[in-house]
Amino acid sequence: PYPTKVEMNNIYKAALRAPDHAWLRPTSFIEIKDKGIEKLSKIFEEFASKNVDQKNIDKYKNAPYRAPMIIAAVNTYKEHPKVPKIEQMLSTAASVQNILLALNALKYSSIWRTGKIAFNKFVDKKLGLEPNQTIIGFIYVGKNKGKQKNIPKINSREFVKYL
């Protein structure tokens, strides 16, 4: 199962509270579920048939079926004298983190997928994006069916310096 419309509305509200210098609103989303998963699978398969080894095509084709819902996070670059492209992309990335946190709070499992399949103009175009738009990643959403992956503990002191 995936989140309800009401839950998703709240999740998107949380996402859109991400830092956004000059209120440019560079972030949008494509919600993919049900028949959309099949469409995305075909797009991934078409991309793979032209860009990866033959033995890996099925991996790309089957990837969307790993979750009942996928959210494509889209960044729309808007030229601005004080807000460079990287800041706008970071705003969209922060919105993805907000989505992951909101999903976790609602007891959904999620993973942020990137790589070749996310960072290419072929998939962007197939999803109807404009030239100034790019996918920041795909968020796979569902309920965990088994034991949750054990994430190693981190000693935060190893990552902090004090001035």
PLM-predicted stretches and their roles:
Residues 123-136:
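Short, electropositive alpha-helical surface patch
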Residues 15, 71, 77-125:
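Small-aliphatic-rich amphipathic alpha-helix that forms the alpha element of a beta-alpha
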Residues 135-163:
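C-terminal helix-cap and adjacent tail motif
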Residues 1-66, 163:
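N-terminal amphipathic, basic helical "cap/leader" segment at the start of enzyme domains
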Residues 29-31, 71, 159:
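Generic preference for hydrophobic
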Residues 34-39, 45-46, 77-79, 121, ...:
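Short, charged/polar surface micro-motifs in flexible loops or helix N-caps
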Residues 70-74, 138-140:
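Conserved hydrophobic/aromatic beta-strand scaffold that supports enzyme active sites
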